[in-house]
Amino acid sequence: MIDYYSTSAEFYELVATRHTASSGPPLSSVLRGVDTSHGPVLEIGGGTGRVTEVIASALPQAEIIVAEPSATMRAMLTSRVARDPDLRRRVTVTDGAAQDLPLPDTLSAVVMFGVAGHLTAPERVALWKRLAARLPDGAPIVVELMGVSSPRVIPPVMSLRETIGRQTYEWWIGGEPTEGDAMRFTTTWKVLREDGRTVREVSDSYVWHTFDVARLAAEAGMTSRRITEAGGRAVPEIGVLVK
């Protein structure tokens, strides 16, 4: 199992807060109609728990299983769950990775944000098969599309800039094609003092297998749709696979 996030985990909440503000509303709109009587809702790749909170709010009666393989991220996730009485009652945190995740016998829905591209196409096909065997007809698998449907060069760009106390944090990200459907993304966090002096940089890279919702639907043998707006506002693309 590869831990993609421990190197930069200290900064993750800065990204997650913004991410959930834009992706939370469309995710909520998809989940609100889900019948949760069939089994738990599964979140694969729970991160620090921001999306978990969205799921719990949209489905106030649902049992939720959250899998997060990174120990550093899982520590923040467990802390978030433990301090909220409602989450503490309904959410089970596990350390499983998508490729070999133990699954309950039945599920009502699945959420995968920031995960699908870490899997190769054969790994995804195997996962879709296991999930489909546990979902009822009409149940959704909600997947974040990430906006990269095929390999391409993405010059480094500053994607976020936030100030905390006397320091400003910049997040830079870029990518380039490697082999087949894969890209290598490189991220750099810069920590700057008030005078603009860089006091620290933390860089990391990972391989991402590109896809679009049509490809995921073909892999899974399911129907699909894209969510591109919520409440009349453009949002990051979300794919919904329906058994």
Language-model regions, residue ranges each:
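Conserved class I S-adenosyl-L-methionine
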Residues: 1-47
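Class I SAM-dependent methyltransferase SAM/SAH-binding core
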Residues: 49-50, 55-100
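A conserved beta-strand element that flanks and buttresses the S-adenosyl-L-methionine
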Residues: 111
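A short glycine-rich, Lys/Arg-flanked "PGG" loop and its adjoining helix->strand segment in the class I
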Residues: 125-137
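Conserved beta-strand signature within the Rossmann-like core of class I S-adenosyl-L-methionine
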Residues: 138-145
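SAM-dependent methyltransferase
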Residues: 145-211
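C-terminal lobe and adjacent flexible extensions of AdoMet/dcAdoMet transferase-like proteins
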Residues: 207-243
